[in-house]
């Protein structure tokens, strides 16, 4: 049975880890994940999804803030694992650790060499791509730059958002890894280098990128909103206060960008630079997330035609 160290953090990673564990082909000697963090409005300390799963399976868990500078590093190297599997871990692996195993592979949620970095799923949606995918690649010191072992694509649907696409790609990544890892270890797959001329990056979303620019087309804003749902969430200003928009639909319409074109007890339509958007799920400052109907029958009653978002 192949002995591996698994490294990952979010739900995407947990899906891959569970696939390895349930396959019965791998002995997971240790799981490495990010430290517990404070999350949500109440800043409650929560374990990562990978840690929760590892504890369920009674696996040793390591949570170094920086693996390269951690005392855990030597202990991991002494485990004498055959290989390392990573999936959305969020840290670089030290060369000494990579050199201590026979193989190290990463499950990355993009069709490399496109979208190296930490937010490939977000950018695939924000940029309006027609497809996304997963690549299994060899680990090297440079971020997501290793030779590609296998990849698989899937269409992006109009109804997809970050959450739904994460779920789809996690399952694809799990199955693809289980399909190709034995053949790769047997030398039956020759990894292919990435084309340097086709490399693009997907760094973590910045606060500036979360803000909606109403002068953009309704398609661009629609893609931004779904490319940040359920996190980090696109936002604008309304009456000087932050106003988050979780979901919206594209509509025909014209007016000054950000201007309210139509308002009723059930619908709120806002002009974009081209076309318009009907807001569906929102969150006013200091309030919980709510359906647009609830907003319009509460705080939204003070709004009227011609009021403008973004100010």
UniProtKB/Swiss-Prot annotation:
Keyword Nucleus in annotation: no
S-S pairs: none
Pfam families: Formyl_trans_C (PF02911), Formyl_trans_N (PF00551)
Keyword Transmembrane helix listed: no
Gene Ontology CC annotations of this record: cytosol
EC number annotated for this UniProt entry: 2.1.2.9
PROSITE patterns hit by this protein: GART (PS00373)
Keywords: Protein biosynthesis, Transferase
Catalytic function, reaction form: L-methionyl-tRNA(fMet) + (6R)-10-formyltetrahydrofolate = N-formyl-L-methionyl-tRNA(fMet) + (6S)-5,6,7,8-tetrahydrofolate + H(+)
Coiled-coil blocks: none
Binding of (6S)-5,6,7,8-tetrahydrofolate, residues: 110-113
MF-aspect GO terms: methionyl-tRNA formyltransferase activity
CDD domains to which the protein is assigned, alphabetical: FMT_core_Met-tRNA-FMT_N, Met_tRNA_FMT_C
Family, similarity comment: Belongs to the Fmt family.
Protein name: Methionyl-tRNA formyltransferase
Organism: Streptococcus sanguinis (strain SK36)
């Amino acid at each position: 049975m192949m002995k591996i160290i698994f490294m990952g953090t979010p739900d995407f990673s947990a899906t891959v880890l569970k696939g390895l564990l349930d396959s019965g082909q791998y002995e997971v000697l240790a799981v490495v994940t990010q430290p517990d963090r404070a999350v949500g409005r109440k800043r409650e300390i929560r374990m990562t999804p990978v840690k929760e799963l590892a504890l369920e399976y009674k696996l040793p868990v390591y949570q170094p803030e920086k693996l390269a500078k951690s005392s855990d590093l030597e202990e991991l190297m002494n485990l004498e694992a055959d290989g390392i599997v990573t999936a959305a871990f969020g840290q670089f692996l030290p060369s000494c650790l990579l050199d201590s195993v026979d193989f190290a592979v990463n499950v990355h949620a993009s069709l490399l060499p496109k979208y190296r970095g930490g937010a490939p799923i977000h950018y695939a949606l924000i940029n309006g791509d027609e497809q996304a995918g997963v690549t299994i690649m060899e680990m090297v010191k440079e971020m997501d730059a290793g030779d590609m072992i296998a990849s698989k694509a899937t269409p992006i649907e109009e109804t997809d958002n970050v959450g739904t696409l994460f779920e789809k790609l996690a399952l694809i990544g799990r199955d693809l890894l289980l399909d190709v890892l034995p053949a790769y270890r047997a030398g039956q797959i020759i990894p292919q280098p990435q084309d340097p001329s086709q490399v693009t990056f997907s760094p973590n979303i910045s606060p500036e990128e979360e803000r909606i620019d109403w002068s953009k087309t309704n398609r661009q804003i629609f893609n931004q909103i779904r490319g940040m749902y359920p996190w980090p969430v696109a936002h604008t200003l309304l009456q000087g206060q932050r106003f988050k928009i979780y979901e919206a639909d594209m509509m025909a319409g014209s007016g000054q960008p950000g201007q309210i074109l139509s308002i009723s007890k059930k619908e709120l339509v806002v002009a974009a630079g081209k076309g318009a958007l009907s807001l569906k799920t929102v969150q006013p400052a200091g309030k919980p997330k709510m359906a647009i109907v609830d907003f319009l029958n509460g705080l939204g009653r003070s709004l009227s035609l011609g009021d403008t978002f973004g100010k």
